[in-house]
Curated annotation (Swiss-Prot):
MF terms (GO), sorted A to Z: imidazoleglycerol-phosphate synthase activity; lyase activity
Cited PANTHER family: IMIDAZOLE GLYCEROL PHOSPHATE SYNTHASE HISHF, IMIDAZOLE GLYCEROL PHOSPHATE SYNTHASE SUBUNIT HISF/H IGP SYNTHASE SUBUNIT HISF/H
GO-annotated biological processes: L-histidine biosynthetic process
Name of the protein in question: Imidazole glycerol phosphate synthase subunit HisF
Key word Ribosomal protein present: no
Length: 255
């Protein structure tokens, strides 16, 4: 049985960690390095940093904080936001990131997934998918979601895009379920299961965790990792207690 991963997500904007609800109304959560160090010391398996404004503003991620994070933690971390080329990815990996994640740039240029996988190996290439469920239950991929003014439907359906990114060479998918983001009432299990059924690569659930049982429900579907932000930033769930709880439920967890 593969070890399940508990991942903390740190949304970065203007050099600070922020958190919104359903990708809106972002509030300051603290210093990037301090939070990274806190999570590294308190049992999180992996960190994901999303520069949520980089793609929307057509900016580059600051290499300075990426390098500082690498110096201050001893767990794997992934960086996302505005990565449009092999050169962008190479710089971030050279500054200490273990993986890079692409979202809107992959929708604009799907071949970027293949090029990154060939240059750095599939294990380094994560594709983030911002999935919105409309009033009819249709799953739609959105892009430029870091800013309410730029967020829009990409024209692709979630399930179609999940299949496509796998064929293009993605090594992992993070499914960001937009409707559930920050509301703490559980992952969208119906959506998660639909994606998991067609996913042949590691799948990470994101959006909706509010209590320990929510992580268990998601892991029972077979997914590889569960990502959360609000419950960890606000210390509503203790990471070490969560891991013990999941291990006691029979899951393979790194304590």
């Amino acid at each position: 049985m593969l070890t399940k991963r508990i991942i903390a997500c740190l949304d970065v904007k203007d050099g600070r960690v922020v958190k919104g609800t359903q990708f809106k109304n972002h509030k300051d959560m603290g210093d990037i390095i301090e939070l990274a160090r806190y999570y590294s010391q308190n049992g999180i398996d992996e960190l994901v940093f999303y520069d949520i404004a980089a793609s929307a503003r057509k900016e580059r991620i600051s290499r300075e904080w990426v390098s500082e994070v690498a110096k201050n933690i001893n767990i794997p971390f992934c960086v996302a936001g505005g990565i449009k080329s092999e050169e962008d990815a190479a710089e971030l990996l050279a500054n200490g990131a273990d993986k890079i994640s692409i979202n809107s740039p992959a929708l604009n240029d799907p071949s970027l997934i293949t090029r990154l996988a060939k240059s750095f190996g599939v294990q380094c290439v994560v594709v983030g998918i911002d999935s919105f469920k409309d009033e009819n239950g249709n799953l739609k991929v959105f892009q430029y979601t870091g800013d309410e003014k730029t967020s829009k439907h990409s024209g692709k359906s979630t399930l179609e895009w999940v299949k496509e990114v796998q064929d293009l060479g993605a090594g992992e998918i993070v499914l960001n379920m937009m409707n559930q983001d920050g509301v703490k009432n559980g992952y969208d299990l119906e959506q998660l299961e639909a994606v998991y059924k067609i996913c042949k690569i590691p799948l990470i659930a994101s959006g909706g965790a509010g209590k320990m049982e929510h992580f268990l429900e998601a892991f029972k579907l077979g997914i590889d990792g569960a990502l959360a932000a609000s419950v960890f930033h606000q210390k509503l769930i203790d990471i070490k207690e969560l891991k013990i709880y999941l291990k006691n439920q029979g899951l393979s967890i790194r304590i």
